[in-house]
Amino acid sequence: DSKGLYGVGYSQEGTFEGMFRANWTTGDIDLMADCHGDTYDVLPTNDVIYVASHAHDCSNIGGFADRSNEGVYHHAVGFSSTATGTVRSNTASGYSDYAGLPAPTQYNGFLPGFENGNYTGLSQAVWTVEGNSQYLVYGGEFIAVNGTKQQGIARFSMSGGDANAAQPGDEGGDNGANDDGKQDKKDKDKKDKKGKKNKQDDWDNQDDWDNQDGGWWW
């Protein structure tokens, strides 16, 4: 888009895993989501950057910690489109260090859980992400989303609330810092004294999550 050139990668074919954006004029990297885990596709829209991946460690930018030893991977991840800090020094073995580069915020309210499929035999879930200002579509070989059977394609409304799995433990369905699934479900209907939804469910501190109204995915 007009902000720059977006790219994603995985370390088997290079030195970086995650998402980056380079300035059109200078070529300098002005945003880097240094999240370990193969990343396959990227979509910037509505001031949020979405990736298709199997990310398992975004701690280098202050995001979710590595739980790959528990089988927790995040296949759909959203980031702010502006830098909110810098990449931390890498301490994980086998990865390059990008400390000091501009880093976005990783949104813990957008971590829907996809269950791996077996079509390619590569133990993957999503391969692509597409969309516009109203809808977000993930495609791949997954066989369920948030514990509900759904194969190969899932559409998310840009006007939804928390997109995470209702129950922690669904494949890739970890809710980050908000991982008490039963409480999340209960809290969705709670409102404060002014009649607004709890901000913990408005993951971008807006009305719903994109300053619109409506539900999440079909």
Feature map (PLM): residue ranges:
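Composition-driven, intrinsically disordered low-complexity tracts enriched in small residues
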Residues: 174-218
